Amino acid sequence: MNSHYENKRFRRKALCTSIALGLLSTPFYASAQQDPEVEEVVVTGSYIRRSEGIIAASPITSLTADDITDQGTLNMAQIVQNMTFNNGSGVTNSIQASGASSNGAAFNLRGLGTRATLQLIDGKRVTNSNVQWLMPSIAIQRLDIVTDGAAALYGTDAVAGVINMLPYKTYEGLKIEHFNEEDSRGDFRDQTTSFLWGKALGSDVDLVVAGSFRHNGTLEWADRPKLMLAGLTDNNGANPTNWNVPQRDDSGALLGTTAKTADPICGTDPITDPTVQGGNKFGTLAFGSCWFPFGDTRDFVEQKTQASLYSNISWEVNEDLALSSQLLWGRWQGHGRQNQGNPGTRFADLSTVRGEIPGNPFRAMSGDGRELFAQPKLDGAGMILSDPFGNQQPLRNGAGAVVLASNQFTNLANDPNGGVPFNEDVPFSGQYLPFGLANTLPQAFDSDDISRKENDERDMRLSFTADFTVPYLDGWEGTSTYSYGEHSVVSAQTQHFSFSAVEQGLNCDVVNDASACFNPFGAADASPYRNSQAIADAIYTRDRIDNKDILQTFDFVINGDISPGGFELPGGAIGAAFGYQRRDETDQNVPTTHQQQNDRLNSIAALPTKFSRNSDSFFAEFSFPILANLEVSASVRDEQFSSGQGDVVSKFGITYSPTDWATLRATQGEAFIVPSLNQLNSPEGCGLSNVDDLFTSFSGFITSCKSGNRALVSETADSFSVGVDLTPIDGLDIHLTYSETDFSDRIVDTTTQDIIRADFAAFQGSSGFVATDANPLPSISQLTAWVNNPLSDPRIQRDPLDITSPTRIDRSDTNASSMLVKSWDIQANYNFDLDAIGFGSWGDFRASLNATYADTYTWQEAPDKPVREAKGHQNNSFGAVPIIPEWRANASLGWSLGNHSISATVRYIDEVMFDANEFSFQQYLRPENLWTTTDVIRAWTQTDMFYTYSDLEVYGGNATLSLGARNLFDREAQKTGMIAGVVSQIQSPLGRMIYARVNYEF
């Protein structure tokens, strides 16, 4: 995308015009006027102390502890998703390109990516942006959200804005709270117990401690059968699977070619309903292929347990020095369900499955369909060798090929020139999946034969702060902080398999040690060819990784007034802040033992890595009170990294209050994001990714491997905002903000579909291929020629024996995208009581509206790609952009009288054009399917409501009881053909959620 020079000139002109108008139209206020003494505080978005309640140039949204309570959930991911200016977050799993998950959520302001939003706790950086368990929600006193660029103050990452969770540092008493929520169908429950305790230890020490414990159960896909049956529940990678079976001519001679053939046991289970646990154990046979049903193994919300702890101790040593220490600790353990194995193996490195392997079902046949027989293999006594199952062994020549009998069409029992029956040697295909219900499963699987995840992540941050009076500088104050943060992942890798164990099982002695053989084919429950338990357990590995991110920061900030020789501007003294920050980052990755030994079936070897870097930053901020009601601010920051990245960025702002009920504000700034250590250096990691192959009819999961890219450069952005804040009458405040972000060199995690799409476009440009009704897809010869063309993308790997099946796509982050985002935010709040207008004392009412209008969201994948409009689209096939509805809005009405209060909120998300793969073929897989075509994801409206009774005196303390419901009218999510059957970024499959909250303070 070309730089938006005209927009930049407009922004500068608008800012300068605002300043000039303020200077020309503002009446002069005498400097001798004395204002009453007010408390000064440092607020998010500035390091300069200001009068409490003053309006800043940057748009800031603040949520108090009560506001967070009114959201009706302790799940911070849900609170994030509810914000109108946040896009791309989710609270349920979908296995879609969006990456929506019930296990983690981070702020994604304006949909510019989670790394474009800087997340702080108490003004300090954290190593993990997952808001679900960073700290107990009961400990959050306020949540500040700055919705424009702030890198000039906070450094890298603050492109779209800054999130600052501000915890309690003083508290007196003990508050205990229990929160329970469950869906009205009784399928899901989520419970949290938390406490907050604080005490003043004498006159100069304050101690606050808070903790929470949360556990939620599982919401399975099968608990929402309408959605599940509408969405994709089968994958082309399977077990039983499709094999590349050798082809022969009519005489029985090998032709050197293979034909994709489904395992004969596929599709023989009479239970075809995917919602039935353990059904479809032999797969689904359709379109000549075997498909793997996985819907009964997946969850919308995975079972997990979270614990978090917060503590803060403050000591006011004297009037010039205060010391404090703060501890954050959290742990998350997840036990989600998943299918028994995933497709994508080192199939080309595996030995061919010999025909002698017990259970091989592919009887050797001539081209015209006649059974073939081989010369028998004899022992030293001239007897025909047989395995323990009575299968006679064929003779092989020096090249390892089976030697056909003289009369290859007759059994030796009927003709002395005949031979023994034999099966074909079949190589593995890229669609092979190591485990399924059709053979023996590892003992580590649960009793329901489902693989359970063992996620285990831990976070901690310890910080020490000194607040002091700056010597020799009258009125100046300073803050110095050291923080040590650590995020560790010691999760078990529960879909990993031993390459050597499979190889050993394939190369077993079928005559003398058949129990050591590995049968990769399907086998009925009573079959003698089922693998032994020892074989299954040897192949399945459950090693743990040991990854660790460490962040150490040292901050030094001083702030005060500059008035050389007593000089002051008409509005007062110039405010200033100067600071320095040192950051040391370490990224340590320790793969599983099997992966270090190159013994993982799913990926290549990976060795432990450890990368570090540091950065030094200097910044300055100034506030120029030109007049009593006109202020201009400026800030600049120089941040340089030892890894070679860095930038010098600035930001300017203005606030102008022509009356006491109106304030105009504007900002213009620069921002940047340096690549993370993981983006630069991460070793190869492989997982599962869904792909729709544009060259063939293949649709399903394949292996997707990602590694670091050391060629990445910093992302850069220019931002502009202008707004007005109005308080025209008592109790009413209105805020309108226009914001614009011009983002370039965006680091994009290219999806597998991005890569396939780009490769297909290159193929069309090279070959001139145009799809028609008669030929909707390229021919096999065209595809083969393209794969051999140096212009094709080498990151796409295909099965050499079945070129129509992609098996693996390699990817990495790239500086490949630019974006221009323009939006409007509207906030209005009105508090009133009917008594004031003569209707009697019916209590206090409060009404609020929060809305975001996406004016435009244009983006470009790469300089040679077209500019696209993301607004109003699902954007499912593009990894760079989330769903961008044109409108999002929340409207609330609350009432309180005495101890009673009621609040209702209506949430609205605009419709968007559906553009994901619908997997239309699934409508033919089974009769239970509810697939329907989709062109628009309809607008989503839900109503949340709660009732609270507060200050109930119980045993010397006060109790508060709340009952409420989210999605009160049980709005059902729209069915789509996507995986999971729901667009989980903007619509929830949970249905009506009923909750109760009780807290007790004393």
Kindly label every feature range from the protein language model.
Residues M76-I79, A105-N108, D157-H178, T193:
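N-terminal periplasmic accessory domains that precede
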Residues L229-L232, T268-K304, D320-S615, G669, ...:
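Surface-exposed, low-complexity loop segments enriched in small/polar and acidic residues
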Residues G687, F845-E953:
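C-terminal beta-barrel architecture of Gram-negative outer-membrane proteins
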